[in-house]
């Protein structure tokens, strides 16, 4: 049967066009119920005598409940799936996963193309009303189709939809009533709080006008926001809450060319970190400098948590954490554009990890208790939840989702999702780290594992005879990695040539020989984006049979590789470059320490040691050449732990030491990545995946320049070369001074990012930190999906494979790059959070005194960096909340905090002695406290 579907579509130019689509209606779409006598049961999923049909809002708002195994035999209509897909892609992915899970009875019914359930839109009928009518028609069809064999129930919280369903003879209930009928009270905790359009179980309350005080301004409607954006009254951007001060946020604005600062929760107006918001600038006389920020209106105080030292500008405290209150006007802080949120364009709500605020148990038991949830992420406000399990949850880490935030409520409302484990338990806190950073740590599915070759695997005769694969097993190949490394991506070789030159080879695991485009394995790797390295755990991007065996370039086994081979002169000039698929057999899997020991031991003259020394000599020349071009030699506070093999607690902690062997391997990996970038861009100028490092703005470098000026140091930041030279000249009285300056420079930089070459102009491809016009990632395909992508590009450039179709879809390529950046960032944050967790565990039983360096002056003290442990945190000179009033003042120009009588002062980069100890100011909330000695 053929039907015409008519709808209006808005063009890019803003005009409305009538669209007509032909719809073919079918009579061979089955209901999916085993009890049905007229439909083919081979595709049936629904076995219960009670089947529920859910509407769009139930799926959108109650997905946490639907994922609970107590909810089953659910019909998800195609019209519901389409609307969910348009409104919330994350929820759409979750409901699709439920529908495809063979262990769950969720059945997708294509009502939009079934001859008996197709619904033609009526004139002047809204899209929402049309969808609701389609849901009712499909539910009524199910009722009549199944008759007495199954009870069919429409579950909806839409008051009007439920009323019409009842009038039309359809059985309908609210989600709350349905859950109560199941006789499992704990499921009620999973219910999202109702919105204004929803039905509550106490409808009488809806008619009573609220007498509660309005705390927040009403959000503007989207029509007004859109008009305001066009007129330049409002500014759109992503709200980013300061990680070190949850009452201060920033919205980047292209229209005014700088960030708009949002001070205080009232001006944030119920916006969450990551929300896309519309911001209105405050009158200029209300723009504030940093010293004007007050958080006295809130119960909470400014963040005083000890953190791992930041690695880039995104992690570092904002300069506005400084007070510029001084004894003279010459040091007054400049005002910054300040604004307030007038509307939320797109929410970034997701599930959050944390615990309930300590409270006494209410009298009686079994009833509903109201509790405040405190997220581990301090950027997130407290969340109100109702729970019937309060006694069991008070000492637990739990997951909570946000449902709404009313103007009359100081805090958002949400619902309990699930427990994680006991507060303070190492496994629990590690799982919190993974959830908070959106790291997928679920086991690989059977569909993914089915893509793997059977074990044991070995190089086949077909691999050896493959004309595109060169046999390099005769070469002395070796790998150099951290100790205990099992997922070995890369190996090297260095051979002296008769003409006095060297042949250098970088051999990378040939992951794409096993991970094919469009397979479940490839889809899973693409979603995960990267492996995640925690202190005592690794979350793999690919299944372990690949990462630790089939692809890993282990010693004394033959493996498939993708090789970059250069001929180099003795002064490390590249004479020629070639790329080839290869077969190698690694002779040794060395640790950095082992490789360094070989190079340093003059008694060793074997071939492997000689090759290492030759490579190291060439690497030093290459490194110096990069530095001469302007590459930055920055520093970060990498921390390493010695772990107890029995209880897995940290035994010792210290800064990671970089050896020449580390730098040698890094140099050849960089060179391989640069060579591959040039090759793929030459052949595929519009669809290559590259990596760029944006040049830092003067504003981003301002904290470094202020610190340098305060200690009499002049830094030239006009180019990466000028900055590199300035950093080389920054030599202080102690040997750690230069490294500290480099650490401060590092945190002024943004992160490097992946991008599609067709999205930017060639000058924007530049990698600032490496001083390289072109760069990509090729050398770690076991642990980074970006490298898998680049391997496919390189293979296609050599004519080995055809370029996969994804490379012809620019928007999809951009989406892939965005996801890779998101996953890479989250992996880094998870790694840092894991280190911070183990630092806390280490100091629980080891209070200690240690030297620290002042890195930032605040109004009531200063931030110190502890070099031995790579951590930083606040040291208070006055009581928290006093903001330095009375006893101390800040000299902004000299970057020091001075006692009013002049008897004592502390300056930036000064060495101080501190005491480090874990304290517990609130139950179950331990923190590392730093105090001045």
Swiss-Prot record:
<dbReference type="InterPro" id="IPR012340">
    <property type="entry name" value="NA-bd_OB-fold"/>
</dbReference>
<dbReference type="InterPro" id="IPR029060">
    <property type="entry name" value="PIN-like_dom_sf"/>
</dbReference>
<dbReference type="Pfam" id="PF13638">
    <property type="entry name" value="PIN_4"/>
</dbReference>
<dbReference type="InterPro" id="IPR041505">
    <property type="entry name" value="Dis3_CSD2"/>
</dbReference>
<feature type="domain" description="CSD2">
    <location>
        <begin position="371"/>
        <end position="438"/>
    </location>
</feature>
<dbReference type="Pfam" id="PF00773">
    <property type="entry name" value="RNB"/>
</dbReference>
<keyword id="KW-0479">Metal-binding</keyword>
<feature type="binding site">
    <location>
        <position position="490"/>
    </location>
    <ligand>
        <name>Mg(2+)</name>
    </ligand>
</feature>
<feature type="region of interest" description="Disordered">
    <location>
        <begin position="296"/>
        <end position="336"/>
    </location>
</feature>
<feature type="binding site">
    <location>
        <position position="481"/>
    </location>
    <ligand>
        <name>Mg(2+)</name>
    </ligand>
</feature>
<feature type="domain" description="PINc">
    <location>
        <begin position="50"/>
        <end position="163"/>
    </location>
</feature>
<comment type="subunit">
    <text>Probable component of the RNA exosome complex.</text>
</comment>
<dbReference type="GO" id="GO:0006364">
    <property type="term" value="P:rRNA processing"/>
</dbReference>
<keyword id="KW-0460">Magnesium</keyword>
<dbReference type="Pfam" id="PF17215">
    <property type="entry name" value="Rrp44_S1"/>
</dbReference>
<dbReference type="GO" id="GO:0000178">
    <property type="term" value="C:exosome (RNase complex)"/>
</dbReference>
<dbReference type="GO" id="GO:0005634">
    <property type="term" value="C:nucleus"/>
</dbReference>
<dbReference type="InterPro" id="IPR033770">
    <property type="entry name" value="RRP44_S1"/>
</dbReference>
<keyword id="KW-0269">Exonuclease</keyword>
<protein>
    <recommendedName>
        <fullName>Exosome complex exonuclease RRP44 homolog A</fullName>
        <ecNumber>3.1.13.-</ecNumber>
        <ecNumber>3.1.26.-</ecNumber>
    </recommendedName>
</protein>
<keyword id="KW-0540">Nuclease</keyword>
<keyword id="KW-0539">Nucleus</keyword>
<keyword id="KW-0271">Exosome</keyword>
<keyword id="KW-0378">Hydrolase</keyword>
<feature type="domain" description="RNB">
    <location>
        <begin position="469"/>
        <end position="798"/>
    </location>
</feature>
<comment type="similarity">
    <text>Belongs to the RNR ribonuclease family.</text>
</comment>
<dbReference type="GO" id="GO:0003723">
    <property type="term" value="F:RNA binding"/>
</dbReference>
<dbReference type="Pfam" id="PF17216">
    <property type="entry name" value="Rrp44_CSD1"/>
</dbReference>
<dbReference type="GO" id="GO:0046872">
    <property type="term" value="F:metal ion binding"/>
</dbReference>
<feature type="domain" description="CSD1">
    <location>
        <begin position="217"/>
        <end position="321"/>
    </location>
</feature>
<dbReference type="Pfam" id="PF17849">
    <property type="entry name" value="OB_Dis3"/>
</dbReference>
<dbReference type="InterPro" id="IPR001900">
    <property type="entry name" value="RNase_II/R"/>
</dbReference>
<keyword id="KW-0255">Endonuclease</keyword>
<dbReference type="InterPro" id="IPR033771">
    <property type="entry name" value="Rrp44_CSD1"/>
</dbReference>
<keyword id="KW-0698">rRNA processing</keyword>
<dbReference type="GO" id="GO:0004527">
    <property type="term" value="F:exonuclease activity"/>
</dbReference>
<dbReference type="InterPro" id="IPR002716">
    <property type="entry name" value="PIN_dom"/>
</dbReference>
<dbReference type="GO" id="GO:0004540">
    <property type="term" value="F:RNA nuclease activity"/>
</dbReference>
<comment type="function">
    <text>Catalytic component of the RNA exosome complex which has 3'-&gt;5' exoribonuclease activity and participates in a multitude of cellular RNA processing and degradation events. Required for 5.8S rRNA intermediate processing and the degradation of 5' external transcribed spacer (5' ETS), a maturation by-product of rRNA synthesis. Is not involved in the degradation of turnip crinkle virus (TCV) RNA and significant virus resistance. Required for normal development of female gametophytes and early embryogenesis.</text>
</comment>
<keyword id="KW-0694">RNA-binding</keyword>
<dbReference type="InterPro" id="IPR022966">
    <property type="entry name" value="RNase_II/R_CS"/>
</dbReference>
<dbReference type="GO" id="GO:0004519">
    <property type="term" value="F:endonuclease activity"/>
</dbReference>
